[in-house]
UniProtKB/Swiss-Prot annotation:
Keyword terms, alphabetized: Ribonucleoprotein, Ribosomal protein
Native organism: Mycolicibacterium vanbaalenii (strain DSM 7251 / JCM 13017 / BCRC 16820 / KCTC 9966 / NRRL B-24157 / PYR-1)
Domain of life of the source: Bacteria
Keyword Ribosomal protein (UniProt): yes
Gene Ontology cellular component terms for the protein in this record: cytosolic large ribosomal subunit
Stretch forming the signal peptide: none
Name the record gives this protein: Large ribosomal subunit protein uL30
MF terms in GO: structural constituent of ribosome
PANTHER family in the cross-refs: LARGE RIBOSOMAL SUBUNIT PROTEIN UL30M, MITOCHONDRIAL RIBOSOMAL PROTEIN L30
Keyword RNA-binding in annotation: no
UniProt record, GO biological process: translation
Sequence similarity: Belongs to the universal ribosomal protein uL30 family.
Subunit details: Part of the 50S ribosomal subunit.
A Pfam family annotated for this UniProt entry: Ribosomal_L30
Amino acid sequence: MAELKITQVRSTIGARWKQRESLRTLGLRKIRQSVVREDNAQTRGLIKTVHHLVTVEEV
């Protein structure tokens, strides 16, 4: 299965609670921190919630 590299590029200051929790669920806490996750429906839903705070690349 394909994997996605997700990098946080913007701060969570001023973000809503659901957006902060989505980033924590993805494993992101700091700007420029990256994680690799499976490309599935759950991950895509979390990314959709915080698409303006992260960048996504296929690995």
